[in-house]
Design a protein with these regions (language model features):
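Short beta-strand/turn micro-motifs at beta-sheet edges
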Residues: 35-38, 128-132, 254-260
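N-terminal secretory signal peptides and thylakoid transit peptides that target proteins
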Residues: 2-19
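N-terminal signal peptide c-region/cleavage motif recognized by signal peptidases
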Residues: 23-27
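C-terminal lobe and pocket-closing loops
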Residues: 137, 223-292, 324
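Hinge/capping helix and adjacent helix->loop/strand transition within the periplasmic-binding protein
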Residues: 96-102, 109, 116-203, 253, ...
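Ligand-binding pocket segment of bilobal, Venus flytrap-like solute-binding proteins
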Residues: 166-174, 178-250
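N-terminal (or domain-start) structured segment
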Residues: 31-128, 166, 174, 190-219, ...
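An extracytoplasmic/periplasmic, membrane-proximal ligand-sensing/linker region
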Residues: 41-45, 229, 255, 277-338
Length: 338
């Protein structure tokens, strides 16, 4: 009888504990839902951590988007610049911020799709970060310098195959997007091209204009477009979702039969992973609404960027696909950071 009594008391205790746990869970969920329904609360500011220095193209775009979101949400949206480590510093701040919708990140997807395959990060790109919305694509141009006499992409590949290693391709650095593009092209065409990694883009562009190498890959932008229009650089191909209006005769790498090499810099908004779904959905909707406005689209076009948008699920899927592709290329080419 005593054993039965103890067992019964134990069972009642367990049931009571389970009930309390369930009630606590339901209460926590209810609080989260209530908090999401009240977001944003009054004049509490939303912070966007921008992974680039103040004054650059990405910062200008982020601030223009912040102004739109502030108007639409009826609350201040402030920008905080945290450049460094290829965007990883800013994304780490976002990953470790409270998941309440008041801290967002603006960055290219590189810290999520390149950096994880090159070294250890202080955050987990999948578990700690929630993609909110794709904002824009910055096309990557494949340019011939004065040292290159190839008139089109096919001629360039023919030269590279005829003289393995003699064609030199400059990028902004080891394991940069341009470097991944180069490796994808080599794997897709069996051409052998010499990689010339720079540290950033300033000196790279100056050396391109003086013909220090044959090929340059760089993001589209007013300065680069000016040199193309002046005939100092020739566009052979572009990495972008479609042809650029300003370079309508230049094919994308996908059109040239190299879809894996058709890479561009994609930028977007991100949040801490456990941000309430209702807040993420609202942020996605408001970002898409902002990107539909003609003045913001004109601002992006003026910097040679292409507005994107789409659902958060689409954005997350694109990130996962590019990360998987980069992992394969980095392994195959044995790319390692010093």
């Amino acid at each position: 009888v005593m054993i039965e009594s103890l067992s019964r008391r134990r069972m009642l205790s367990l049931c009571a504990s389970a009930g309390l746990a369930a009630a606590a869970g339901a209460s926590s969920q209810a609080r989260a839902q209530a908090s999401a329904a009240q977001w944003p609360a009054g004049s509490k500011p939303v912070r966007i951590v921008v992974a680039y220095p103040a004054g650059g193209v990405s910062d200008v775009v982020a601030r223009a988007l912040a102004d739109k979101l502030s108007t639409q949400l009826g609350t201040p949206v402030v920008v905080e610049n945290k450049a460094g480590a290829g965007g990883a510093i800013a994304m780490d701040m976002v990953a470790k911020a409270p998941a309440d919708g008041y801290t967002l990140g603006f960055s290219s997807i590189s810290p999520l799709v390149l950096s994880p395959h090159l070294g250890k990060l202080p955050f987990d790109p999948v578990r700690d970060i929630a993609p909110v919305a794709s904002v824009m694509v910055s096309p990557v141009l494949l340019l011939a310098t004065p040292a290159c006499d190839a008139k089109d992409f096919a001629a360039l590949i023919a030269q590279a195959k005829a003289r393995p290693g003699e064609v030199r391709w400059a990028t902004s650095g080891l394991a940069s997007l341009g470097h991944i593009m180069l490796e994808q092209i080599q794997q897709g065409t069996q051409a052998r091209i010499t990689h010339v990694p720079y540290k950033g883009g300033g000196q790279q562009l100056n050396d391109a204009l003086s013909g220090q190498f044959e090929i340059l890959s760089t993001n589209a932008g007013p300065a680069v477009m000016q040199h193309i229009q002046a005939g100092k650089l020739r566009a052979l191909a572009v990495g972008a979702p479609g042809r650029l209006e300003a370079l309508a005769a230049v094919p994308t790498l996908a059109e040239l039969g190299l879809p894996a090499a058709n890479l561009s810099s994609q930028f977007g908004l991100f949040a801490p992973a456990r941000t309430p779904a209702a807040v993420l959905e609202r942020l996605n909707a408001e970002t898409r609404k902002a990107l539909d406005q003609q003045d913001l689209r004109a601002r992006l076009a003026a910097t040679d960027n292409v507005p994107t948008g789409g659902t958060a699920a689409d954005f997350a899927r694109q990130i996962a696909q590019e990360s998987q592709g980069n992992a394969r290329v980095i392994r195959a080419a044995n790319i390692q950071m010093n």
